[in-house]
Design a protein with these regions (language model features):
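Solvent-exposed, flexible loop/coil segments flanking beta-strands in beta-rich domains
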Residues: 1-40
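C-terminal interaction-tip segments
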Residues: 1-15, 113-136
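Exposed aromatic-hydrophobic patches
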Residues: 31-33, 91-100
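Noncatalytic modules at the cell exterior or secretory-pathway interfaces
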Residues: 41-46, 100-121
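Short amphipathic, basic-aromatic surface patches that mediate peripheral association
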Residues: 46-55
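Short coil-to-beta strand junction motifs in C2/discoidin
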Residues: 56-63
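Predominantly extracellular/luminal cell-surface or secreted proteins
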Residues: 64-70, 112
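Solvent-exposed serine/threonine-rich low-complexity stretches and specific carbohydrate-binding patches
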Residues: 76-88
Length: 136
């Protein structure tokens, strides 16, 4: 397991959905900082399930990593992973993806709602886990 710290997590797997509750379509929200102090890249897996959405949604969720220097997040130094597309007319979004966390750097994790609908104010789940590249 990669030795990494994430200030938003007290355990490897946690429900991180609170910042996403009620987020409007097209909006990007900050989830937390990820600091990779190892000399290897590691991977962050994310699984997101929304509460029941109204109206029904079709679209995607984007995971954005922005390199942090001091207290500034560099938008031009980003890695983006899209958590799949929902089916047309989905009332509940269930998406998963993994993203590489480059080593020896601190990254801000942001998630963008591209679902075409507001994420419900409750009933959402966002779970994360990490693994290093030697394992996979």
């Amino acid at each position: 397991m990669a030795k990494a710290t994430w200030s938003a997590l007290s355990a490897e797997s946690a429900n991180l959905a609170t910042p996403l509750n009620g987020v409007a379509t097209g909006t990007t929200v900050f989830i937390g900082d990820i600091e990779n102090t190892t000399n290897k890249d590691f991977y962050l897996g994310l699984w997101f399930q929304s509460g029941s959405m109204s109206p029904t949604s079709t679209g995607s969720i984007s995971v954005i990593l922005r390199r942090k220097r001091g207290s500034v997040y560099a938008e031009n130094n980003s890695e983006i992973q899209v958590l799949g597309l929902t089916g047309t007319g989905s009332r509940q979004v269930n998406l998963a993806a993994s993203i590489r966390i480059p080593y020896a750097a601190t990254w801000g994790l942001f998630i963008q709602n591209n679902l075409g609908a507001t994420i419900p104010a409750s009933g959402n789940t966002l779970v994360s886990f990490t693994w290093n590249e030697e394992v996979n």
